[in-house]
């Protein structure tokens, strides 16, 4: 029985994502939370892309 508990804990540790490591920006709300701006096409000069805003053509950009 102890082995089952140990295996369950190990699987939970492996399968659950670490909150700090995965900062996936895929919609406009998460873009705004990360102090970004949604822009169609490419990001403006002096800005870097940090994700997308729902569609691949709309980029989430943030000042460098």
Swiss-Prot record:
It holds the Pfam family Defensin_beta. The keyword Disulfide bond applies. One of its GO terms (biological process) is defense response to bacterium. The keyword Endoplasmic reticulum does not apply. SMART domains: DEFSN (SM00048). One of its GO terms (molecular function) is chemoattractant activity. Residues 1-20 form the signal peptide. Has bactericidal activity. May act as a ligand for C-C chemokine receptor CCR6. Positively regulates the sperm motility and bactericidal activity in a CCR6-dependent manner. Binds to CCR6 and triggers Ca2+ mobilization in the sperm which is important for its motility. Monomer. Homodimer. This is Beta-defensin 1. It comes from Sus scrofa.
